[in-house]
């Protein structure tokens, strides 16, 4: 299935982002494939959905946070989490859960601290999904 692999190229990882999110990592897809009962076609379909649906949700989270609408940011973050947990529940999914908690508590400091890490992690997962589809 996924044979290509690239290194992190010496990039420093962010403290809150697991190292597996900083380079193409076939093990992310191996775990997802296991959760999907080995159905590679379904994995690719879900990857395509993630690739298409992530940008507007990320924009929605960012815009809602910037405008102080934490309820809307929470809803978009929840939808974003639903897209990523099949692929990476312990990385992206966990970061988004932490962001959702901060949004629910309206903890501005934590929201701003976590939002960048979440977005970076989700964008990296999206990039990996694009590679899977190539």
Language-model-detected regions and their locations in the chain:
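Two-component system phosphorelay core
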Residues: 1-134
């Amino acid at each position: 299935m996924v044979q290509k692999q690239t290194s992190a190229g010496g990039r420093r990882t962010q403290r809150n982002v697991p190292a597996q999110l900083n380079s193409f990592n076939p093990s992310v897809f191996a775990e997802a494939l296991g959760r999907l009962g080995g159905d590679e076609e379904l994995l690719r379909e879900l990857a395509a959905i993630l690739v298409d649906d992530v940008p507007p949700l990320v924009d929605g989270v960012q815009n809602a946070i910037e405008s102080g609408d934490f309820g809307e940011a929470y809803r978009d973050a929840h939808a974003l989490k639903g897209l990523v947990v099949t692929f990476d529940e312990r990385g992206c999914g966990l970061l988004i859960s932490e962001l959702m908690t901060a949004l629910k508590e309206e903890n501005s400091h934590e929201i701003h601290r976590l939002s960048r890490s979440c977005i970076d992690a989700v964008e990296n997962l999206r990039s990996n999904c694009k590679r899977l589809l190539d």
